[in-house]
Design a protein with these regions (language model features):
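Helix-biased detector of long, well-ordered alpha-helical tracts
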Residues: 1-343
């Protein structure tokens, strides 16, 4: 069964050369590992724009689903170093959805957008057979910025430090602790499970990215979504044409993340990690970025360096083994997620 994002080979074969009319105003077109597009709109300004679908699961509160919708969409603009400003969304609902549930979702989306300073300027809402739960067919988030003021995952340079916020497998741990709570409760303390469930409200990198950008020296940012931290690191290195040496033992590892990954035999660095921000920055700026993040209540650590040789992109694992940075063939979150749905 094919689950999640298409792989690099499929993207290259079927999408990369099917991007509509060529337009010289497109400065950053669709490409693997790049979270948003950039268009020159004249007057020294650019439009930064991103698109995402959002799914939910039956036991996730609808308020949280609404919160996810805005934060996940906004994160893809924020990682370009630009504050999100506008959004549209398409809310698709099963026909049996109550007006109470509809109100809960749209109230949450509205409230979250207000908190982030985002105006909702369009969208679509409707009831459709075949759906078993509400979903966002697409959220589009965009903003204007000065030309040259944004970053992309292609900006990493040799000598840069590599920073990771929060640690690996944030989204994996949060969602699975909700979906498979009863299984965890048989083996682990309630206090740790509560911490894991609270990670659902950490599935965002909006503040992480904007704080880092304000500190200065950032050359690239990327949120570690499908394929996790190891996949996200590869995408930065590949887009930038550089090498990278990173160390798993330098990553922050919350106990609740260890618990979930241990319980379901998941490799933390390979699992979907929305909420974990990867940053490369000039070495002189790294301490300042870490301080600013920690001052904002966002844990972060330096996990390695960017190197010159693109043939050498490695991660030293906690057991001492050295593995190449690569996008996992299968994100380990999905089998654990669908097994949980079937229980």
């Amino acid at each position: 069964m094919k689950i999640g994002k298409i792989d690099y080979e499929t993207f290259s074969r079927f999408l990369l050369d099917r991007l509509g009319k060529k337009d010289k105003t497109v400065l950053v077109p669709p490409m693997t590992g790049v979270d948003a597009g950039v268009v020159d709109v004249g007057g020294g300004k650019v439009l930064v724009i991103a698109e995402d679908p959002i799914f939910t699961m039956p036991m996730l509160p609808l308020r949280t689903f609404g919160w996810f919708t805005v934060h996940i969409g906004a994160s893809d603009v924020a990682v370009m170093g630009v504050k999100p400003r506008y959004m549209t969304y398409s809310l698709l609902l099963p026909p049996e959805t109550s007006t109470k549930d509809l109100k809960t979702i749209v109230d949450s989306i509205h409230k979250t957008a207000v908190e982030l300073g985002i105006a909702i300027v369009g969208g679509h809402t409707g009831y459709y057979p075949g759906l078993t739960a509400p979903m966002i067919g697409g959220i589009t988030v965009f903003a204007f910025a000065k030309k040259g003021s944004y970053v992309t995952p292609a900006g990493a340079r040799p000598g840069n430090g590599v920073i990771l916020t929060k640690g690996p497998a944030i989204e994996t741990s949060g969602l699975l602790s909700v979906l498979r709570e009863r299984e965890l409760a048989k083996k682990y303390p309630k206090s740790l499970i509560r911490k894991a469930k609270a990670l659902c409200r950490e599935i965002t990198v909006v503040e992480d990215a904007l704080v880092a950008m304000m500190a200065g020296g950032v050359t690239a940012m990327h949120d570690a979504t499908e394929g996790g931290v190891i996949g996200g690191l590869f995408e930065i290195a590949n887009a930038s044409g550089v090498g990278m040496e990173v160390y798993e033992n330098l990553m922050i590892y919350p106990d609740e993340v260890r618990m979930v990954c241990e319980a379901f035999a998941i490799d933390p660095v390979a699992a979907i990690a929305e909420g974990s921000l990867l940053i490369t920055a000039g070495a002189a700026f790294v301490p300042k970025i870490i301080r600013r993040l920690e001052r904002a209540g966002i844990p972060a650590s330096v996990i390695g360096t960017v190197t010159k040789d693109p043939r050498k992109r490695t991660m030293r694992r906690r057991d001492g083994s050295v593995v190449p940075l690569a996008i996992p063939k299968q994100d380990p979150f999905w089998p654990a997620f669908f097994k949980g749905l079937s229980l």
